[in-house]
Amino acid sequence: MTAIQHFFKTFFLTELLKGLALTGRYTFKRKFTVQFPEEKTPISPRFRGLHALRRYENGEERCIACKLCEAVCPALAITIESETRADNTRRTTRYDIDLTKCIFCGFCEESCPVDSIVETQILEYHGEKRGDLYFTKDMLLAVGDRYEKDIAAAKAADAPYR
C-alpha cells in the first residue's frame, strides 16, 4: 500500500465507516442473546450436569466400590473409600466429588460397570462457599433419589447409542 492510499484511508476514516455499516446491518435483525434466567434454551439429551449416585429398585446402593471412576478421573475430583461387608461384597463408606475440580468429561459415568454414578441434566446449582460444591455420598444419593425417573428416562433414550 502506498503512502497516498494509506493517507486517504485514514483521512476519510474508511475503516470506521465499514465498522458502522456492519453494525447498522445487524441493528434491526433478530437478536441472538438469550436472557437466561427468564428464557431457557433447549438442553441436549447428552448434556452432562450435576452428578448423582443411583440405587437399585430394592433401595440398595448400586456402587460396588470398584474405584474405576476414581482411577479414570483426569481432574482427580473423585475420592472413594470402601469396606468389605460380611457377605464379602464391597460397598463405599465415602464417595466424594469436588465439583470445583470436576471438568464434567463423563469418564466416570462411562467407566462405571453398574451405572451407579451418572451426570444428570441439572445445570442450575450453586454454592455460596467453596465447600458447598464438595458433594458427599449422602448428597449424591439424595440427588439420585430425587431425579431417578429423569435419570432412568435419559438412560433409556441414550441406550441405542451406547
From Swiss-Prot:
Location(s) in or outside the cell? Cell inner membrane
Keywords for the protein's UniProt record, in alphabetical order? 4Fe-4S, Cell inner membrane, Cell membrane, Iron, Iron-sulfur, Membrane, Metal-binding, NAD, Quinone, Repeat, Translocase, Ubiquinone
Q: How does it sit in the membrane?
A: Peripheral membrane protein
Partners and quaternary state? NDH-1 is composed of 14 different subunits. Subunits NuoA, H, J, K, L, M, N constitute the membrane sector of the complex.
Organism (species):
Burkholderia cenocepacia (strain ATCC BAA-245 / DSM 16553 / LMG 16656 / NCTC 13227 / J2315 / CF5610) (Burkholderia cepacia (strain J2315))
HAMAP family per record? NDH1_NuoI
| Family to which the UniProt record says this protein belongs | Belongs to the complex I 23 kDa subunit family.
For activity, the cofactor(s) needed are: [4Fe-4S] cluster
Which InterPro entries does this chain map to? 4Fe4S_Fe-S-bd (IPR017896), 4Fe4S_Fe_S_CS (IPR017900), NADH_quinone_OxRdtase_chainI (IPR010226)
Cofactor, how bound (note): Binds 2 [4Fe-4S] clusters per subunit.
Show the GO MF annotations: 4 iron, 4 sulfur cluster binding; iron ion binding; NADH:ubiquinone reductase (non-electrogenic) activity; quinone binding
Q: Which gene encodes it?
A: nuoI
Q: EC number(s) of the enzyme? A: 7.1.1.-
Instruction: List, for all copies, the residue spans of the domain called 4Fe-4S ferredoxin-type.
Output: 54-83, 93-122
UniProt keyword Iron present: yes
Residues the entry annotates as binding [4Fe-4S] cluster 2: 73, 102, 105, 108
Give the protein name, as stated in the record.
NADH-quinone oxidoreductase subunit I
Gene Ontology biological-process annotations? aerobic respiration
Pfam families assigned to the protein according to its UniProt record, in alphabetical order: Fer4_7 (PF12838)
**Gene Ontology cellular component list:** plasma membrane
Q: Does the keyword Ribosomal protein apply?
A: no
Q: Where does [4Fe-4S] cluster 1 bind?
A: 63, 66, 69, 112
- Reaction(s) the record says it catalyses: a quinone + NADH + 5 H(+)(in) = a quinol + NAD(+) + 4 H(+)(out)
Q: What does this protein do?
A: NDH-1 shuttles electrons from NADH, via FMN and iron-sulfur (Fe-S) centers, to quinones in the respiratory chain. The immediate electron acceptor for the enzyme in this species is believed to be ubiquinone. Couples the redox reaction to proton translocation (for every two electrons transferred, four hydrogen ions are translocated across the cytoplasmic membrane), and thus conserves the redox energy in a proton gradient.
